């Protein structure tokens, strides 16, 4: 469970129908699974993520809405927190960009 007082929150807009946005998020999740071993589990329009990236425990929830994706993650309380937030924001923007195509 992610506590609101110790969490990072991002909102990234998109222009897709919800199923298409979910599919694009799945591309990103597949990449993170292959690269870092991050696990994910979908429940409707929400996906729960867990694992370790660069030795830092990650727990997050992404919620796919009609015009945006909201990402809430535990705050790792390390010097990497700001970099991690920026990384996730850039990845979400990339995969939700209208011209992005999965290779």
Q: What are these regions, as identified by a protein language model?
A:
Residues 1-38:
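Terminal, regulation- and interaction-focused segments at domain boundaries
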Residues 12-18, 53-55, 64-66, 73-77, ...:
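Beta-strand elements of well-folded, non-transmembrane domains
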Residues 23-70:
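Ser/Thr-rich, low-complexity intrinsically disordered terminal regions
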Residues 40-41, 66-68, 76, 88-90, ...:
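Short, charged/polar low-complexity linear motifs in solvent-exposed/disordered segments
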Residues 57-58, 79-81:
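A short local loop/turn or secondary-structure capping micro-motif enriched for an aromatic residue
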Residues 80-103:
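A conserved amphipathic terminal alpha-helix motif
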């Amino acid at each position: 469970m992610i506590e609101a007082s110790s969490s990072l929150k991002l909102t990234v807009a998109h222009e897709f129908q919800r199923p298409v946005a979910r599919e694009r998020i799945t591309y990103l999740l597949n990449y993170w699974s292959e690269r870092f071993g991050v696990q994910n589990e979908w429940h409707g329009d929400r996906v729960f993520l867990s694992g370790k990236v660069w030795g830092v425990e990650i727990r997050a929830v992404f919620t796919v809405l009609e015009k945006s994706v909201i990402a809430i993650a535990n705050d790792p309380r390390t010097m990497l927190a700001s970099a991690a937030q920026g990384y996730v924001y850039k990845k979400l923007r990339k995969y939700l960009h209208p011209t992005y195509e999965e290779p």
